Amino acid sequence: MFSLQHVLLILISLGQVYSQQVHHNAGRKFPQWLTGLIAMTVFLFLVLVVYVAKMFWDKRSQESINMKDIEEVVANGTSECCEARKENQYISCNMKDLRSSEHIHAYENPIEVNDNVRSTAM
């Protein structure tokens, strides 16, 4: 039975024998300008595929967000009303709504719900 060393020796010598053969058709299959044109077309097609995939991904994530027009924020027993705009996905509050009832120079931190955050395992 052949050992592993004999098999590797035969494979290496066969590779050397095949590489020494004369190739009659040594010219290029395509001219250089056509090779560049094909490469550019493939690149632009891949960019288009990535762009369309990103557009569908963003559309799907925007449809999955369910926010109310008005959210109620409760902090330290006080109730504050903030309007949420759906198109820009941010909550706008007046400064008087954020003032703390405990101290005149202190402000409350409202809870902001953001379902659009994507996280991945590292």
From Swiss-Prot:
Induction: By retinoic acid. Expressed in prospective pronephric mesoderm at the late gastrula stage. After neurulation, expressed in the intermediate mesoderm, eye placode and blood islands. Expression becomes restricted to the pronephric proximal tubule during embryogenesis, but is absent from the connecting tubules. Pfam families: MAP17. It is found in: Membrane. The keyword Disulfide bond does not apply. GO terms for biological process: pronephric nephron tubule development; pronephros development; pronephros formation; retinoic acid receptor signaling pathway. Its main location: membrane. It is a single-pass membrane protein. One of its GO terms (cellular component) is membrane. Keywords: Developmental protein, Membrane, Transmembrane, Transmembrane helix. The chain crosses the membrane at residues 33-53. InterPro entries: PDZK1IP1/SMIM24. PANTHER family: MEMBRANE-ASSOCIATED PROTEIN MAP17 (PTHR15296), PDZK1 INTERACTING PROTEIN 1 (PTHR15296:SF1). Essential for pronephric tubule development, acting upstream of pax8 and lhx1/lim1 and downstream of retinoic acid signaling to induce pronephric mesoderm to form pronephric tubule-specific cells. Belongs to the PDZK1-interacting protein 1/SMIM24 family. This is Proximal tubules-expressed gene protein. It comes from Xenopus laevis. The gene is pteg.
